[in-house]
Swiss-Prot record:
Highly expressed in most brain regions. Also expressed in other tissues such as lung, kidney, liver, stomach and spleen. It is a multi-pass membrane protein. GO terms for biological process: potassium ion transmembrane transport. K(+) channel subunit that may homo- and heterodimerize to form functional channels with distinct regulatory and gating properties. Can heterodimerize with KCNK13 subunit to conduct K(+) outward rectifying currents at the plasma membrane. The homodimers are mainly retained in the endoplasmic reticulum compartment and may be targeted to the cell surface upon phosphorylation or other activation signals yet to be elucidated. K(+) 4 binds at residues 129, 256. The chain crosses the membrane at residues 39-59, 145-165, 213-233, 282-302. It is found in: Cell membrane; Endoplasmic reticulum membrane. It comes from Rattus norvegicus. This is Potassium channel subfamily K member 12. Residues 256-261 are annotated as: Selectivity filter 2.
Length: 430
């Protein structure tokens, strides 16, 4: 007898079906560019927000507009009949009045529009992007100069707002960190000899502590409300407006919407005029800076909602395409049953269990290597640079962690870049 092992049966060439992967192509494409998905989702939500706002304002303001048109038509007809003036001639006269109104002419005595104080008020509304519209350049030279002046003025003012945002966030973080240290010291978690910047502070529970965006939002919101209430009290007593109209003017001005239906400091003379104009300037300056900072903090919350919605959509897509977590993954061939494959391996003298364990080890090793490479090259250079600069300026530890997770805030520009790693919700470790 021959000592040779029995020759295995000839292997049939069978066409293998594609093996279903855990993450299908649609899931992979959904993760390619999360920023694009966030942008598209935000654009869709803004569109829905505009539709909802237009519906509400149309329902609230449309009846009043119809009544005002009816009253104005009746008044015009009565005046034309009472004074014997033809209605077309009366309308032509009203068009001349509208042109004079656009040029700054008013029926009541108002302050000059283009003296130095009036021009200073105008350029202030230009560079702050408020743009009330009560004063506009009428000459060609004035319009041409406004284009160049507004280009650099608006850019410089936006930079000023961003620097103000950086300072106010740093100040709030410093105050809240001091309150946190005091609370920990009272509870006995910090020794009485604790000093910021020491080695103990870096190893203790305050290492890398950052204020929550909700606390910053609450503080900025309370300060904005207090500022608007104080300014409204001044406008009510000096301008003679209702308190609700004064609050409305404060929001329209501080948010740089600037409708122009209500404009402060437009009368020819005021009691304590110099003091009032100074107070008006300071209130508008502080209000615009505060509301700008508040808007940027609110944008962080909106971005968190967008990230949550994207995660939900991604998880829903993955649950349709991928097996449930914890389910055993079958490594059988789609054509050859497992029993036949085991018999063939036994005929070849190969242990199926050892073969599976070896393949499993190689697969896990490959996954670990790929995950390690992915973590090392996960766009951490810019985020780490911003984190180091921010933590150096705020006294945070300089420990560098390369295992940063993309939360949608790292590597931002503008106001989001300024608040990067300064709040708990914009930290790269979240």
């Amino acid at each position: 007898m021959s000592s040779r092992s029995p020759r295995p049966p000839p292997r049939r060439c069978r066409r293998r079906l594609p093996r279903p992967s855990c993450c299908c192509c649609c899931c992979r494409r959904s993760h390619l560019n999360e920023d694009t998905g966030r942008f598209v989702l935000l654009a869709a939500l803004i569109g829905l927000y505009l539709v909802a706002g237009a519906t509400v304002f149309s329902a609230l303001e449309s009846p009043g507009e119809a009544e005002a048109r009816a009253r104005w038509g009746a008044t015009l007809r009565n005046f034309s009949a009472a004074h014997g003036v033809a209605e077309p001639e009366l309308r032509a006269f009203l068009r001349h009045y509208e042109a004079a109104l656009a040029a700054g002419v008013r029926a009541d005595a108002l302050r000059p529009r283009w003296d130095f104080p009036g021009a200073f008020y105008f350029v202030g509304t230009v560079v702050s992007t408020i743009g009330f519209g009560m004063t506009t350049p009428a000459t060609v030279g004035g319009k041409a100069f406004l284009i160049a002046y507004g280009l650099f003025g608006c850019a410089g003012t936006i930079l000023f707002f961003n620097l103000f945002l950086e300072r106010i966030i740093s100040l709030l973080a410093f105050i809240m960190r001091a309150c946190r240290e005091r609370q920990l010291r009272r509870s006995g978690l910090l020794p009485a000899t604790f000093r910021r910047g020491s080695a103990l502070s870096e190893a203790d529970s305050l290492a890398g502590w950052k204020p929550s965006v909700y606390h910053v939002l609450l503080i900025l919101g309370l300060f904005a409300v207090l500022l608007a209430c104080c300014a409204s009290a001044m406008y009510t007593s000096v301008e003679g407006w209702d308190y609700v109209d004064s609050l409305y003017f404060c929001f329209v001005t501080f948010s740089t919407i600037g409708f122009g239906d209500l404009v402060s400091s437009q009368h020819a003379a005021y009691r304590n005029q110099g003091l009032y104009r100074l107070g008006n300037f300071l209130f508008i300056l502080l209000g615009v800076c505060c509301i700008y900072s508040l808007f940027n903090v609110i944008s962080i919350l909106i971005k968190q909602v967008l990230n949550w919605m994207l995660r939900k959509l991604s998880c829903r897509c993955c649950t349709r395409c991928c097996p449930a977590p914890g389910a055993p993954l079958s490594r059988r061939n789609a054509i050859t049953p497992g029993s036949r494959l085991r018999r063939r391996l036994a005929a070849l003298g190969t242990d199926p269990a050892a073969r599976d364990s070896d393949a499993e080890g190689r697969r896990l090793s490959g996954e670990l290597i790929s995950m390690r490479d992915l973590t090392a090259s996960n766009k951490v250079s810019l985020a780490l640079l911003q984190k180091q600069l921010s933590e150096t300026a705020n006294g945070y530890p300089r420990s560098v962690c390369v295992n940063t997770r993309q939360n949608g805030f790292s590597g931002g520009v503008g106001a989001l870049g300024i608040m990067n790693n300064r709040l708990a919700e914009t930290s790269a470790s979240r």
